[in-house]
Amino acid sequence: MSQPILVFDSGIGGLSVLAEIRKLLPHHNYCYLFDNARLPYGELEEQELISGCVALIDQVVERTHAAIVVVACNTASTVVLPALRATLSIPVVGVVPAIKPAAQLSKSKRIGLLATPGTVKRHYTYELISQFADDCHVELFGSSELVLMAEQKIATGQLDMARLAQVLSPIVEADLDVLVLGCTHFPMLRDELQQVLGKGVTLLDSGEAIAKRVKTLLAETKSEQQVQEDANRDSVMQAFYTKAEISEGLASMLVDCGFSTLERITTINSNR
């Protein structure tokens, strides 16, 4: 098996990023690693987040011989990337909230960032706003509940729209024309978010930009012959999780997505 692309997240949100990468690289092999034992990441202390993520990703990279790692989690990307890059010898791609394109797209210059509490409070987020949206009024909204709602939707096919409307009410009242989805779970709720917020609010995420970056990096590290060989073989997809068990609904969804292997990875702090 050729070296896979390893996509990592705390839960199923990173599947939205993996889907964008597969559009550009449909024949590549993929590993999806989700640390659902510690979900949601937005409520973890910084050092706990760093040490756990680095140990887990390093373990799976060594096992799968991954060619590249995509940290498809905004919360983890804001704090884990330096330590991860210092540990691994392969390229590591993180997620950056789409603040810059949001500022460029906004006509009212009133934009919002919807993310986890962890991402909202990071200094990195404020640096992005200062650098790319200095001419905009930017509202920040942090929610861990939306992460769990996205997980529930995928696992059960159900979503409490009344509760979603309550969670989003501060955003509705903020009178924005562009909202950045600063958590990879949130594109899973795109249709429902749009329904509550209305067509006057444009929703932006970073999935497409990440996919283009991954394709560029792989092209730099592979020969033309290797690229051609990848294009001529069927894609193999493996999923790894850290919780003791996953629901039948989630397992069924992963199989429907094309994953041929679902396996629990035992690591520190994974007994929840």
From Swiss-Prot:
The keyword Isomerase applies. Pathway: Cell wall biogenesis; peptidoglycan biosynthesis. Transmembrane segments: none annotated. This is Glutamate racemase. Keywords: Cell shape, Cell wall biogenesis/degradation, Isomerase, Peptidoglycan synthesis. InterPro entries: Asp/Glu/hydantoin_racemase, Asp/Glu_race, Asp/Glu_racemase_AS_1, Asp/Glu_racemase_AS_2, Glu_race. It is an enzyme of class 5 (isomerase). One of its GO terms (biological process) is cell wall organization. Belongs to the aspartate/glutamate racemases family. PROSITE patterns: ASP_GLU_RACEMASE_1, ASP_GLU_RACEMASE_2. Signal peptide: none annotated. The active site is at C73 (proton donor/acceptor), C183 (proton donor/acceptor). It catalyses: L-glutamate = D-glutamate. It comes from Shewanella sp. (strain MR-7). PANTHER family: GLUTAMATE RACEMASE. It comes from the Bacteria. Its EC number is 5.1.1.3. Pfam families: Asp_Glu_race. GO terms for molecular function: glutamate racemase activity. The lineage of its organism: Bacteria, Pseudomonadati, Pseudomonadota, Gammaproteobacteria, Alteromonadales.
